[in-house]
């Protein structure tokens, strides 16, 4: 029994500093600026953080030197896979449609990857 409890405790502490990160690769559409994207994204994060007890963070990575200055990235950081799943379920239910329309009007995102990140 002590061995099982010790193993569970080690598992919990090893994931305590882990986050789930979603990385989007996007481009600005004509007539829109990175400031437009940042405003939409800020409102999106505020809404996400109203929905659960977990806290999300989001970053807009703006190119400072690139062969395509319309390209940028989003990094959305969720506390864990459960948090990401809760938000994803709400997206599937249409709770984020107003933001999706705004993002689609200003950006084209062709790729997304989901990562588990741990501090090292």
Each model region followed by its residue ranges:
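Conserved active-site beta-strand-loop modules that form the wall/rim of enzyme catalytic pockets
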Residues: 7
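Positively charged n-region of N-terminal signal peptides that target proteins for export
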Residues: 1-4
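Non-heme di-metal
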Residues: 97-100
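Short S/T/G/P-rich N-terminal loop/turn motif that feeds into the first structured element of a domain
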Residues: 10, 14-94, 105-120
């Amino acid at each position: 029994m002590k061995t099982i409890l010790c193993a569970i405790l080690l598992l919990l502490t090893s994931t305590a500093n882990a986050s789930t990160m979603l990385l989007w690769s996007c481009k600005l559409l004509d007539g829109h600026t990175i400031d437009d994207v940042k405003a939409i994204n800020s409102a999106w994060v505020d809404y996400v953080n109203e929905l659960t007890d977990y806290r999300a963070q989001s970053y807009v990575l703006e190119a400072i030197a690139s062969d395509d200055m319309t390209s940028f990235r989003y990094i959305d950081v969720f506390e864990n896979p459960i948090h990401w799943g809760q938000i994803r379920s709400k997206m599937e239910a249409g709770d984020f449609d107003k933001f999706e329309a705004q993002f689609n009007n200003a950006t084209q995102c062709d790729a997304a990857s989901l990562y588990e990140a741990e501090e090292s």
